[in-house]
Amino acid sequence: RVKAVKFDTAIFTNLTRDHLDYHESMEAYGNNKKKLFTSEGLSRAIINLDDPYALSVINAIAPSVEMYTYSIKNSAATVYAESLTLTRQGFEARVVTPIGAGVIKGKLFGYFNVSNLLAVISVFVSYLPKKKELDIEQLCELVSGLSPVDGRMQIVGDTSEITALVDYAHTPDGLR
């Protein structure tokens, strides 16, 4: 589907059963994802270290490609979350990056949303000159203001004891 597209930056978020209707097997799906990270012209790769398939993707990346990693659990990543807390209002985490650290308080729900935000922060960091503390503070402020899209981990009811969310995820991995 993307043969004619030249990518500058590629992000590996995960490898799940989500698109097995399109791919014949997990192995075939993984191999197709790896093609993105070996494509001509790629200059940056952003990799989720929390996914078991991450090492396979990392091993496929050419040495000329600048690589950044992110994680909600692993402090060895280039960008990672410290003291991550999920709440009934969303989440709070301290994000550590090569250009500094900052706190994000988001209105998004679920670990997958925090992980996706770390991917976005990683892309931003990859394009910045090093040691620009103000930029990470501004980025954390912007990220904290994001809201979920309609129908995806969206609050539809809230009382003092129960928060009701609607999510149209169609696979078990989409509900994590």
Q: What is each of the regions a protein language model found here?
A:
Residues 151, 166-176:
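Glycine-rich phosphate/pyrophosphate-binding beta-alpha loops
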Residues 6-163:
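Acidic, Mg2+-coordinating active-site environments of NTP-dependent enzymes
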Residues 1-3:
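Conserved helix/coil segment N-terminal to the catalytic DExD/H
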